[in-house]
Amino acid sequence: MLYRVGPSMIRRLVLDVLKPYRPSVVDLSLALSNLDGIEGVNIIIYEIDQHVENAKITIVGTEVEFDVVKKKLEEMGATIHSVDEVASGKKLIEAVKTPQDVSARI
């Protein structure tokens, strides 16, 4: 399935990913940052198991294509657990806290 959000596409994508030890986070970050439309990649490893690492991957760009990112991750042996944030449109909107968020995670 191809995810398109108008002409500007996705501008920020935050993924929870399970990846093997190899390739390294450096190699994975460089591979993702070389995809068309991507301007920056940030990978944080938040858990290490015996054979895999859990990573939060933040990708920003002018035209981030979800399916292209997913395919590259799969080629490198990684699996997307969840899509934690998507921002699209002409302007990036930051999340703001509201009174309803007191018990919610943001």
Predicted regions and their residues:
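Short glycine-/aliphatic-rich beta-strand segments at the starts of folded cytosolic domains
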Residues: 8-19
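Short hydrophobic/aromatic beta-strand micro-patches
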Residues: 16, 58-60
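Short amphipathic alpha-helix segments
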Residues: 20-40
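Helix N-cap motif at beta-to-alpha junctions
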Residues: 21-22, 60-66
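Short amphipathic alpha-helices in soluble, non-transmembrane regions
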Residues: 27-32, 68-77
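Conserved short beta-strand edge segments in small beta-sheet-based binding/regulatory domains
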Residues: 40-43, 78-89
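A short beta-turn/loop motif at secondary-structure boundaries
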Residues: 46-51
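Short, low-order "capping/linker" segments at domain edges
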Residues: 54-56, 90-106
